[in-house]
């Protein structure tokens, strides 16, 4: 029996002779439809089409292979029914020649067949990505050298504006950014020149009609509509009476003012600007609270009016921070710089093209551009027309079918237009995709191509037609209802670029059937009533402000951090998975298995954890879930270069190339290949403190130190040197891939790692390095030195390669993957984690923004005055880019939701649940009845914000509404079911490993069970054993390891307790006691801020450790350094915002800061964040220990010294403090940390071998240095 197609699917399969757009929602069977359409075209009708007369374009090579395989299977099945069919046999024979391919592969085929038309050597190859990056870097270096030699003033201004203080790296990055961006379009040089000319503007009147001005106006009208809506709601509340009538004196004219602004905007940007500059909000009339019936209504009306006021003030003070005249002048001023920059980009592009031609290589951008060059000609007037090759393709292809059309970009669209008959008679393009799943903006995917056709194509007979497949055959009704509710409430033309309404909603197409004896595995037939399926969509929120173990903020040491919320969220997920696998009520959770046609018990492999990005999350999740005994796998794409086996081999390669590298030589010597010990390293270093280890090893082998070292160590050194010399000799002539395999064999290291834990994985990693070397050998670079550069570049450009994949798809493990990697897949149970993570908008902070339609958005930079500010054009482009970023995030969320077949669980964390619920309710209350208005959606900072905003309007959202005090109109008609649970930290602080069962030992006092003297004797013996006391019991409380912070705290607590006893003894007045003892339990403290004082201190220390000491003079330099840390994801965006750059500048301007900088600039040693481990007597920690018994006991002390630096006459120790300190209480503050600083001094004295001359605390709060006196 064949597949039963829906009416819409039948139309998509059989409609011919038109351009056809199939909008296929998630789970609608679009691939099956596409394959069936092809099969019918090549096997049915009076004139079946040969399969090589079709061009089928897919998004990935894997998709192309799957498509070819499915078509082949379908033809083979048809042949089984009709073995004599010559037509079918012909199609099977032609299948290998069929153009079922990615766009890049099609372009490559066109180039190979027509290389002579573009003067290309037929022996070309596709360059390795890293090889191409190295070529780019070489070209940039040569280009800048030539430009500096020309001594061009405009170039110097460009370097001053965008270059760094010590290098041109930033300007290099900008040139590469421009190049990569323009190459995603069909006419890169033309686009760049046209967009630069937009800066050549002379009057305000020229602004009108600019595309970016229209976008700016769209953004402004959104803000004005928001402001108007809030004011009218405030008016409605005030008009209801209850004592709020005085507010109407302000609100009525303010509503008129906003309406006038909207009218002015419709008449032009100049009129709007003039009107905006005159806009004002007076002081709100006071209302006596005693006369107010409903205080909540008062607060709501006031809040709505204030929010409206902020919107207008933001437009006036930020968007239009300069006048229109200044905006025009600013753009004019940037015109020469932009022209110079575009010239550099074009020159770079030309040189890069020439270098590739010289080496006979192409990159992926070349494939599309050279293909287009072959496919187009120009007429006498310069207009583009199809070339002869393109015309031949138009005749050849009966149909061009494009899969995943929503992810096409402009140049691919142009190529499809050249080889198809889209715009002429007999249209023949079939496009299938779902714009709601367009999530590849970073690859320059342009969803507007899909949207433009979606809007203009008709649903009935026409040359341009669309068909909508919105029946979902993947998910249960519970999932469908949940997806539809969330996205009807949130997704709009503004955020999502599509209005999600009834027409766009998913329709149920899957049939799972009731759970009964006929469709369940045999072993569960008798337990039908004890089985579970599906259930509510679950929302789990970690409240980071929940109950915490009490600790004052200033007691948290700088080396300490709160337990990471990522770990806690992983524990929530661990508990949910355990609950699914083994419910506490003894039931069983079941999923439907299509292959069995029955329900079976859930397995780990049925569960996937989806994350927006796996970096910094997946590894923690794997570790935490492991503590619950959950098998889990995460393909993070990272960690390869950090594996011990790869680090060891790379260390060997580094010293074979250049042995004068101590870090690499120590790494190699410490490895099992040579097995040097730490003590032997110390012995070698003591022989000579100034020379490289390699030089010392050579001298050892030469016999210079025979009296100072053992024969065994000399033998080890000779063994190492002999091997190193042999390897260096072979490396000079062997191809690098052969040499690496020789190393594996000669050291037996490949076999050795195979015996280690995860040995198969480790050997696979080594094979990847060998394969990488083989790829390198095919490039234009040769030799070990260049290979090491190649690997270093690979680390920087690609970040990491990820460990080798050895996991089969049927392994019974929970998988962790990014939402992007999950696209096209489906899972019975989806756990969407990390939804509280804020959206990444870092790209919007860059100096220059690029947009395909709107052009170039840059700051206005005055090099001479050293000032910069955003141009009006940049404001517009930034706003547009932000809308596109958030629209894509909305679509990514849709992709995540629609991966679930039967169960969806959502987790996320917030800093303060009560505050978050208030914000969600506020956004909901100020929106329409059943939707969150786009302005409020734009305020959301995370997926969790969006989901919870929507749920405030849902019947199951009581928990959120109750916490947030929300007075909201509910959508009572929705069928989806949701359950909500908030988690406090205290619930999650124990993992499964920490949980211990209590051993309750009952001691019977009665002797009714004692029957003999023997029994009595045994009882006495048992009691003696149980009553045994360890002789050294006092030392059991003394830790073997302790941090400096813990030691400081222990002493402070002892002092605090003594002070408390003194107070109790000496003060009879109860009030005085209360005044002096001010500690409160954590739950009585006021709610903490999003970043505690301790967390801010940790962030400050991190910045002080990593900041470039050459860039600490000016505020802008420090701010730029912090921004770099955020871009590199060393700090989160929110952490970057709390860094007080002014405080940091104050330090470096202080006497102490200047002394540190002077040491740095004069080449003396400056150390930051030095970790140490030393030993101290245990009596320092436990003062009640008897020195006669414990005097020799030592405790290992560990800590981190913030900074110390060298001066002519000795070293200076420095410790940063961010604590709150009252002016005048400096002495108490010094005493508080004196023991810590003295321990640091003692440790440094041992390390340096000389006395530290001075020690300081630096208080960021007081902005002063505090000297610690010698004791």
Curated annotation (Swiss-Prot):
UniProt-listed InterPro entries: AddA, DNA_helicase_UvrD-like_C, DNA_helicase_UvrD/REP, P-loop_NTPase, PDDEXK-like_dom_sf, PDDEXK_AddAB-type, Restrct_endonuc-II-like, UvrD-like_ATP-bd
Give the coiled coil ranges: none
Q: What's any one GO cellular component for it?
A: cytosol
Cofactors that this protein relies on: Mg(2+)
Q: Which reaction does it catalyse?
A: Couples ATP hydrolysis with the unwinding of duplex DNA by translocating in the 3'-5' direction; ATP + H2O = ADP + phosphate + H(+)
Q: Which part of the chain is the UvrD-like helicase C-terminal domain?
A: 528-824
Where ATP binds, per the record, is at 24-31
Please name the Gene3D superfamilies in this protein's record: 3.90.320.10, P-loop containing nucleotide triphosphate hydrolases (3.40.50.300)
| Residue ranges annotated for the UvrD-like helicase ATP-binding domain, each copy included | 3-476
Q: What is its EC number?
A: 3.1.-.-, 5.6.2.4
Which GO terms label this protein's molecular function in UniProt? 3'-5' DNA helicase activity; 3'-5' exonuclease activity; ATP binding; ATP hydrolysis activity; double-stranded DNA binding
One Gene Ontology term of the biological-process aspect is: double-strand break repair via homologous recombination
Xref: PROSITE patterns: UVRD_HELICASE_ATP_BIND (PS51198), UVRD_HELICASE_CTER (PS51217)
Report the domain of life of the source organism.
Bacteria
Entry keywords, A to Z: ATP-binding, DNA damage, DNA repair, DNA-binding, Exonuclease, Helicase, Hydrolase, Isomerase, Nuclease, Nucleotide-binding
What family does this belong to?
A: Belongs to the helicase family. AddA subfamily.
Question: Matching NCBIfam families, A to Z?
Answer: addA_Gpos
Describe the task this protein carries out: The heterodimer acts as both an ATP-dependent DNA helicase and an ATP-dependent, dual-direction single-stranded exonuclease. Recognizes the chi site generating a DNA molecule suitable for the initiation of homologous recombination. The AddA nuclease domain is required for chi fragment generation; this subunit has the helicase and 3' -> 5' nuclease activities.
Q: How does it assemble?
A: Heterodimer of AddA and AddB/RexB.
Q: What is this protein called?
A: ATP-dependent helicase/nuclease subunit A
The organism named in the record is: Clostridium perfringens (strain ATCC 13124 / DSM 756 / JCM 1290 / NCIMB 6125 / NCTC 8237 / Type A)
